[in-house]
């Protein structure tokens, strides 16, 4: 438990991996900075019509890197 708490303070927390999680982009908040696109190692995001889109949701490992780098809070992960 303590290591989990310390991990949070160190910014190393991971999102609980569950198959029922869905990732989306809130386009009311998204500034199209491409941070999520650049940080994702699993090619979850793509650029379509000059916008970042979720292209390969099945590739998402729920690592949380895109959530961490999004300064605008535009990445949403929720239960299906």
Curated annotation (Swiss-Prot):
Cross-referenced PROSITE patterns: 4FE4S_FER_2 (PS51379)
Residues reported to bind [4Fe-4S] cluster 2: 60, 63, 66, 70
Binding site for [4Fe-4S] cluster 1: 30, 33, 36, 40
Family matches, as InterPro entries: 4Fe4S_Fe-S-bd (IPR017896), Fe-S_Ferredoxin (IPR050572)
Cofactor stoichiometry and binding remark: Binds 2 [4Fe-4S] clusters.
Signal peptide: none
Any Pfam family: Fer4_9
Cofactor(s) required for function per UniProt: [4Fe-4S] cluster
GO molecular function list: 4 iron, 4 sulfur cluster binding; metal ion binding
Transmembrane segments: none
UniProt keyword annotations, A-Z: 4Fe-4S, Electron transport, Iron, Iron-sulfur, Metal-binding, Repeat, Transport
4Fe-4S ferredoxin-type domain boundaries: 21-49, 50-80
PANTHER family reported in the protein's UniProt record: 4FE-4S FERREDOXIN-TYPE DOMAIN-CONTAINING PROTEIN, ADENYLYLSULFATE REDUCTASE, BETA SUBUNIT
Protein name: Uncharacterized ferredoxin MJ0061
Organism of this sequence: Methanocaldococcus jannaschii (strain ATCC 43067 / DSM 2661 / JAL-1 / JCM 10045 / NBRC 100440) (Methanococcus jannaschii)
Lineage: Archaea, Methanobacteriati, Methanobacteriota, Methanomada group, Methanococci
